[in-house]
Amino acid sequence: MPFFQEIKINEQTTAYFWKISEDIHWLFENVQLNEKSSSRLETMSSIEHKKGFLAVRMLLQHVDFTDFDLFYDAFGKPHLEDKRQKAKGKSLELNTQHISISHSHEFSCICISNQSIGIDLEKRKEKTLKIAPRFMDISHLENLSEADKIAKATVIWGVKESVFKLKNEKGISFPNHISESPFQLEDKKGKAQLHFNKITED
């Protein structure tokens, strides 16, 4: 079972990663799906998307939840049933009503916390750099090599996607409402602000 990594972000927040190496049939046979998820899976045309979807459910089971504990609000934001569960093999008891989900290529991840959160996985690709003017301040890419431009644009896209998932309200625009403070790739961290509906949040 290719559970890949657990990253403890703080006392209340942990991210879990799954490296997808199984075939679609193995994943399907080893997850429990509710009726809505089964119907949703059937509508997916991409095998890659199906595997990412199922790997997320494998991660839920890894931390003692199932697909039946997962639900989505009117804006499409995922939540877990409000209960206290213990992660496998861990003594820390997590209040796990908040969850964020992402999958990209051969990885899926979930982030679980007792506060609202957002997480995003992205593979570096040239396309992200080409569309960078649509979602970011391209002055933040000045004086960088082509590879570093792709890397930084990918990071900024992921940051903005995470902020959007955290707030998840209709009308939020990446270029108009989410801004990133200048940072260097080697910083390994950064700061973003959401300016929406006359409210500013860090």
Locate predicted features.
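Core catalytic alpha/beta fold that binds nucleotide/phospho-ligands
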Residues: 1-202
